[in-house]
């Protein structure tokens, strides 16, 4: 299992939002490049970067992403506002390892087919965000009448990874829902990256035991609830 620290970008700063709400931040740091470097210095082997401005349609942070890639020697995955092939290709050309797509793919499945032809499925992460058992899109504002497993099955042979977010606990530091993750792992062969509500080393142990591919950790690292080095030790042992 790999641990993937999250660096969320807004207005060229590193932020942490509560429940994805742009007006509710519980953290703002001025130098995202330094934040990324610190995670890598502590042993992170992969980074998860979300461009919130691109996601909200209020600009983008591509220059910051470019600088992070230049300064760290680990691969990064990037999500947020990837609504056409040009943006995806531009990110890959900047040195991004994987692009994360969600809403666009779920509303227009052909987008994944086209993206697959352009960059290959190993570079594609499908974001499946779940609230009260159903998939949500458009920044968690709209519900789709499908369960996570139904959406995953639809794209199973077209994407390399699934990023599964449990919106019910995201950014609230509430712990994880093991049952929902267990079901996904049992029903699909795609590597699953889990995000949402991870607060303790116990959560990480539980996810490791389930056999998940990776976990994204945000709030808990920034608030000092999880020590990255200790988390990485659990994963390696």
Swiss-Prot record:
Pathway: Amino-acid biosynthesis; L-histidine biosynthesis; L-histidine from 5-phospho-alpha-D-ribose 1-diphosphate: step 4/9. GO terms for biological process: L-histidine biosynthetic process. Keywords: Amino-acid biosynthesis, Cytoplasm, Histidine biosynthesis, Isomerase. It catalyses: 1-(5-phospho-beta-D-ribosyl)-5-[(5-phospho-beta-D-ribosylamino)methylideneamino]imidazole-4-carboxamide = 5-[(5-phospho-1-deoxy-D-ribulos-1-ylimino)methylamino]-1-(5-phospho-beta-D-ribosyl)imidazole-4-carboxamide. Its main location: cytoplasm. InterPro entries: Aldolase_TIM, His_biosynth, HisA_bact_arch, Isoase_HisA-like, Isoase_HisA-like_bact, RibuloseP-bd_barrel. GO terms for cellular component: cytoplasm. The active site is at residues 8, 129. SUPFAM superfamilies: Ribulose-phoshate binding barrel. GO terms for molecular function: 1-(5-phosphoribosyl)-5-[(5-phosphoribosylamino)methylideneamino]imidazole-4-carboxamide isomerase activity. It is found in: Cytoplasm. Its EC number is 5.3.1.16. Belongs to the HisA/HisF family. This is 1-(5-phosphoribosyl)-5-[(5-phosphoribosylamino)methylideneamino] imidazole-4-carboxamide isomerase. The lineage of its organism: Archaea, Methanobacteriati, Methanobacteriota, Methanomada group, Methanococci.
